[in-house]
UniProtKB/Swiss-Prot annotation:
Reactions catalysed, as given in the entry: uridine(38/39/40) in tRNA = pseudouridine(38/39/40) in tRNA
Protein name as catalogued: tRNA pseudouridine synthase A
UniProt KW tRNA processing keyword: yes
Residue pairs linked by disulfide bridges in the UniProt entry: none
Length: 266
């Protein structure tokens, strides 16, 4: 069978992360279950399988990318039909036989939605803190990883209504790096302690109460994954199904937020 790649969007909140784990529900576990039900494979995992990234529990994705050897009849729409609503496959690409969704990715982009409705006065401080984390640094104090911690980040902050939107792009990321970058920016924005950034980026380990914890995973989205020479085709039926599903989820959340706002008026 030919190697094929698929774009996957998912609401990560119901899942214990992307990567398969025993005894808990994960996005990859749901993908494998769907493929087994469709008789695409019957082993431990599909031949040639790899994914662009391993998002943490609660993190969502717009363009997670998985690739494996798959029959031509497996369209995104057919794939989605065997999946639960929070997971939607919406595009596909024919890939070379040696294609690897992890190793062949040239860039990954994450977006973090920081709810800050009453904090416009400190937007410049937040942007300045993020700017100091942009570029090439050793982020050993912002990840549990102990090796390969030097990364080059391109990060920006924009205001969108009640939200500060942080966009971070890199060739690859250490574990929890984006969430800890956001957490550090939030701390510096709140306290004005810009020296904290120099300490965290320094050579000495920063741990315990002085360490930087990861920010809440729920506002984080894996927005894009780029590959050289790979052209994805949007399955319009699958894409429309995804839009309808996520619009319904958005409406539900708006209603819940309105009720919570009413209760907060006590």
């Amino acid at each position: 069978m030919p190697r094929r790649a698929f774009r996957v969007a998912y609401d990560g909140r119901p899942y214990h992360g992307f990567q398969r784990q025993p005894d808990v529900s994960t996005v990859a576990g749901e993908l494998f279950g769907a493929l087994r039900r469709l008789d695409v494979f019957d082993g431990a995992k599909p031949p040639g399988y790899a994914a662009a990234g391993r998002t943490d529990a609660g993190v969502s994705a717009r363009a997670q990318t998985v690739a494996f050897d798959a029959p031509a009849w497996l369209t995104p729409d057919a794939f989605t039909g065997a999946l639960p609503d929070p997971i939607q496959v919406w595009a596909h690409a024919d890939a070379p036989p040696e294609f690897h969704a992890t190793h062949d990715a040239v860039a990954r982009t994450y977006v973090y939605y920081w709810y800050a409705p009453d904090s416009r006065a400190t937007d410049d401080r937040a942007a300045g803190a993020l700017d100091r984390l942009t570029g090439t640094h050793d982020f050993h104090n912002l990840t549990p990883n102990t090796t390969n911690t030097v990364r080059e980040l391109d990060a920006t902050l924009d205001r969108d209504g009640a939200f500060r939107v942080i966009t971070v792009r890199a060739g690859g990321f250490c574990r929890e790096l984006v969430r800890r970058v956001v957490s550090l920016v939030q701390l510096v924005t709140e306290t004005g302690d810009t020296d904290r950034i120099d300490t965290v980026l320094g050579d000495e380990p920063v741990a315990g109460p002085d360490g930087v914890p990861p920010a809440d995973p729920h506002p984080l989205v894996l927005h894009a994954v780029a590959y050289d020479g790979l052209s994805f085709t949007v399955d319009e039926d699958a894409a429309e199904r995804a839009r309808t599903t996520f619009r319904a989820a958005r409406a539900d959340h708006h209603e819940r937020a309105r009720v919570a706002g009413h209760l907060a008026s006590i």
